Each structure stands twice: as C-alpha cells, then as structure tokens.
Swiss-Prot record:
Record has Membrane as a keyword: yes
Top-level taxon: Eukaryota
PANTHER family: NA(+)_H(+) EXCHANGE REGULATORY COFACTOR NHE-RF2, PDZ DOMAIN CONTAINING PROTEIN
Modified-residue entries (Phosphoserine), positions: 130, 183, 186, 254, 269, 280, 303
One cellular component (GO) term of this entry: cytoplasm
Record localization: Endomembrane system; Nucleus; Apical cell membrane
Membrane topology summary: Peripheral membrane protein
Stretch forming the signal peptide: none
Subunit structure of this chain's protein: Homodimer, and heterodimer with NHERF1. Binds PDZK1. Interacts with SRY. Binds ADRB2, SLC9A3, P2RY1, P2YR2, RDX and LPAR2. Interacts with MCC. Found in a complex with EZR, PODXL and NHERF2. Interacts (via the PDZ domains) with PODXL (via the C-terminal PDZ-binding motif DTHL); interaction is detected in glomerular epithelium cells. Interacts with SGK1 and KCNJ1/ROMK1. Interacts (via the PDZ domains) with SLC26A6.
Keyword line: Cell membrane, Membrane, Nucleus, Phosphoprotein, Repeat
Region (Disordered): 112-145, 242-337
Xref: SMART domains: PDZ
Name of this protein: Na(+)/H(+) exchange regulatory cofactor NHE-RF2
Organism: Mus musculus (Mouse)
C-alpha cells in the first residue's frame, strides 16, 4: 500500500490514434461515477498512464462525477482528436473519501493537502461504496456521515467565481452545473449537482433563474451560498424541513415518528412547498387553523353538547370544499409546463 503523502489524482492527456483512445469506460452498480474497465496495450490511453480500475473525476476540466454514462461519453467526444481526463486509482479515492476531500486538478500537480491545511473543503459527498441511512450516510469504513447543508464563502477572482448555475426543467430549484478547477468556487467546497438554497442569507428556492443570478451579483466581490448535495437534499425533503444556516453546524432535524409534527423537528422550519407536504387534518386549505379546546389542552376530554356537535359537522362540510386556487400559484404551475 502506498504512503498517503504519495497518493494523488492523475491528469491523463490522450491523443486519439487510428483505433481510438484505447480504453473502455463503464459504470458499476452500487458505486457512484464512471470507471476505466480496460486499457488496450500500446494504445494512447496506456501511454497516458490510464489504468483499469481508475475512477473518472473530470473530463476536459469539467467534473463528471454526477453525470450519466452517456453524458460522460459525449464530453469525451466533444473535443475532436484529444481529451484530458482527471482520474483516481482505488487507494487515492479511498484516501480522499477518508479525509472527505473533493478531487481537483490542482491535487494532480500539488498532491493532497496536509490534513491541517485550511483550504481543505468541508465534508461533501460520501464515498462511492457507502450505504444510506435515515440520519446520515454510513460509510463502510467509518462512522455515519451527517447529512448537512454546506455554507460556501466565495471571494471573486480575476476570472469570476468559477461556477456555472442552471435550472432543470424536471425539478424545481437552481443547481450547480460545473465548478472550474482551482477556482474560488472549488476552494469554497462548492460542487457540481449541488442545489442552491440561500444566497447571502436569503432563501432563493422560489425565485427564477435571473433573480437568483441578480442576488449573487448584488455583492460585488463575494457571495455566501448555502447548498445541499443530492443526498442531503433528499434527506431534508423526507423530513419536510427547509435547510438553513443553523443546520450547517447546529442541531439536525430528526426523522418523523408517529405523533410527531414536522414543525417540531429540532427547530427546523417546515417546507413551504405544498407539493412536499401531505394534507394535514389540523390545517384548513385556506390557511386557517382549528380553534383549540382549553379543556382538552388541560387534559379534560368532555363530551360535546348538541350545539357543539352541530357546529362541528357544519365546519367539516365546509372544509371539504375544494380550495380556491391562488392565481399567482396558478401562473407558476402553468409556466412549469
């Protein structure tokens, strides 16, 4: 086994030959990413030091860890006659996972940073061989990883922040499409596939793409972005809690159990999106709430009078009527189609 200080990603530059590049790419069930399955002897891939078992991290400077096999193949074919691949072998991949570092092109030149180095990003993706759980991501070689949002502080460089933001028609929200290697975004811990929750302390989940971009540009030379990776996003959605800066280092919401209201989850706020919440019997669709019975709150359960029973029956019939649609919401729904 190689010493940790000698481990580093490899940047392989391939020039296409008459028979192609000479390597085979495939995905592995249960593991995230694309892997080099075979390298042909005497091929450009072998000359570039590409090896079977390597995991592909970047293609021509773009992180592809969250992309499908087809998308990765198209990126390799996009530049005719040559390609540049950032890869990690199994040992390096495990070391990066153990230290919760994200692989970058800079590491191929400088090696892995010392453990005390301040530019190490905060924990992000779990290792590719990890198993999910309700409260965190359980790594086969270590303790469970807490699923938390990440607060990324970016200072604008000469080339900007170094990330690309996009919206996806198939799902609401704004997503990080790519992060430039060695950029302020990369050093802040921002990653491709992250979903943007807040910009400079303001929730932007309901804003349009142009509005989010304007918020990022509002402060000229810096931005503070609260983001969640796909696993953390799913976890918080299951709990029906909107991630906030408090969840970065503070108490995390607990899984919902019988008799527990989502609003009681360790101070977490309930997700405002109606599509994420099942109907509640205690809340009317028009936003009003049931009046509390002071006797019941004190522990006394009294039988209703005839008048009370009649009033309750009338209220139940009223509440079964279909709610009036908010016209702003209606336009939103239509625009999504």
């Amino acid at each position: 086994m190689a010493a940790p200080e000698s481990l580093r990603p490899r940047l392989c530059r391939l020039v296409r030959g008459e028979q192609g590049y000479g390597f085979h790419l495939h995905g592995e069930k249960g593991r995230r990413g694309q892997f080099i399955r075979r390298v042909e002897p005497g091929s450009p891939a072998e000359a570039a030091a590409l090896r079977a078992g390597d995991r592909l991290v970047e293609v021509n400077g773009v992180n592809v860890e969250g992309e499908t096999h087809h998308q990765v193949v198209q990126r390799i074919k996009a530049v005719e006659g040559q390609t540049q691949l950032l890869v990690v072998d199994k040992e390096t991949d495990e070391e990066l996972c153990r230290r919760q570092l994200t692989c970058t092109e800079e590491m191929a030149h400088r090696g892995l940073p010392p453990a005390h180095n301040p530019w190490e990003p905060k924990p992000d993706w779990a290792c590719s061989g990890s198993l999910g759980s309700d409260t965190g991501q359980k790594d086969v070689n270590g303790p469970p990883r807490e699923l938390r949002p990440r607060l990324c502080h970016l200072r604008r460089g000469p080339q900007g922040y170094g990330f690309n933001l996009h919206s996806d028609k198939s799902r609401p929200g704004q997503y990080i499409r790519s992060v430039d290697p060695g950029s302020p975004a990369s050093h802040s811990g921002l990653r491709a596939q992250d979903r943007l929750i807040e910009v400079n302390g303001q929730n932007v989940e309901g804003l349009r793409h142009a509005e989010v971009v304007a918020r990022i540009k509002a402060q000229e030379d810096e931005a503070r972005l609260l983001v969640v990776d796909p696993e953390t996003d799913e976890h918080f959605k299951r709990l029906r809690v909107v991630p906030t800066e408090e969840h970065v280092e503070g108490p995390l919401p607990s899984p919902v159990t019988n008799g527990t209201s989502p609003a009681q989850l360790n101070g977490g706020s309930v997700c405002s999106s109606r599509s994420d919440l099942p109907g509640s019997e205690k809340d009317n669709e028009d936003g009003s709430t049931w009046k509390r019975d002071p006797f019941q709150e004190s522990g006394l359960h009294l039988s209703p009078t005839a008048a009370e029973a009649k009033e309750k029956a009338r209220a139940t019939r009223v509440n079964k009527r279909a709610p009036q649609m908010d016209w702003n919401r209606k336009r939103e729904i239509f625009s999504n189609f």
